[in-house]
Amino acid sequence: FFGGGNIAQALISGLLLNGMSNKNIFFVDRNPLNQKKLNNLRVKSLKKSNSDIDIVILSVKPKDAIQAYKEILNNYKNPKIVSLVAGIKSSTYIKLDNKSEFMRAMPNTASKYGQGITALYNSSFKKSNFKKVSSIFSKLGTVIEVDNDSKIDTFTGVIGSGPAYFFQTLKSFEKKLMRLCNQDEKIVREIIANLMKGVGSSIEKDGDLDNLIKACLLYTSPSPRDKRL
């Protein structure tokens, strides 16, 4: 991992949780706080270039991406690079170097728990190497291959920010539940977690959102008899 911020930490945690050895994961990051968090996961910092590194995952902020990409090119011979950086198209990187294998990936932070969603776009990876990367991300949840570079940017909003939309909605539930449950945070957290688990299970078993909405409304709406009572 070239960059050890939040998304890198989430992916590394998920990989370790799902059986990958920490001996197979390395990181490069100058931030002392990130170094400390990753060291706590028993992942080693790579102090210098290593020809044994199979895949380099570019996981820095967009403003640092091109400089970091150049550093990778200078330190690794014909590297296989997977970019997690939002908003920078494959062509921008390939113009700098067209010999290295390159692809983009857009995971979300739920990868930390093995419940993530990752979109992949293959720019120039060999088929066998692309399968290897897809296999790695499949340890973290669902993998979707897209056929267009621009779709990765769309997935940034849908997948990357998707959990935030739900969390924002849940904040209003939390506020009401706190009043109903006499400010008991533990109970409220349990209710919200079970609510989301139930929603997930319902979608897995049925899948038709209209039917699920109707079922909920039928269950919660009073019948004519109830109204008379």
Q: Which ranges hold each PLM region?
A:
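Short acidic-hydrophobic, aromatic-tinged amphipathic segments that line or gate anion-handling sites
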Residues: 44-48, 145
